[in-house]
Amino acid sequence: SSVIFPFPRTGDVEKDSEPFRRYQLIRLAPDLGGESNDASSFRIYSMVCVHMWCLWDYIEGREVEVNGEKFTGNIECPCHGSNYDVRDGLSHKGPAIKQSKPNDALPTLPLEVDENGDIWVLPPDTALEADGVVGLGRYV
């Protein structure tokens, strides 16, 4: 499952709908450990494809193979066909895979899950070596 949300949220409907504020929280499939109720079950990625800044789609039930490993769930850009590994946001198919680092991985947001099961987004480190920059990428 997944949910799309703005970050940082401003309360202004127009600003909160800007593409560069759109992130998607993804609960990993069970074959990737997604049944756990801790932070390891979740990923948050910027929805802006690092290839040409289109907004990607999360295909929850899609079976994919990356480097010989098969799993469920894929991030796909409908504009030019870039695909990203749901586990780490690194491109594995399409034009984004041909881009030099750090322009081949989706920026992320850190998160934690508290004792009540609530998910909290933590302040990001926007360095390319950390959580990355929307539209540019990050090092993986």
Segments the model singles out, each with a brief description of its role:
Residues 1-65, 105-140:
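N-terminal pre-ligand scaffold of iron-sulfur
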Residues 61-64, 70-72, 86-117:
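Polybasic, low-complexity binding patches
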Residues 52-53, 78-83:
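Detector for the c-type heme attachment site
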Residues 44, 72-74, 79:
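Disulfide-bonded cysteine motifs in exported proteins
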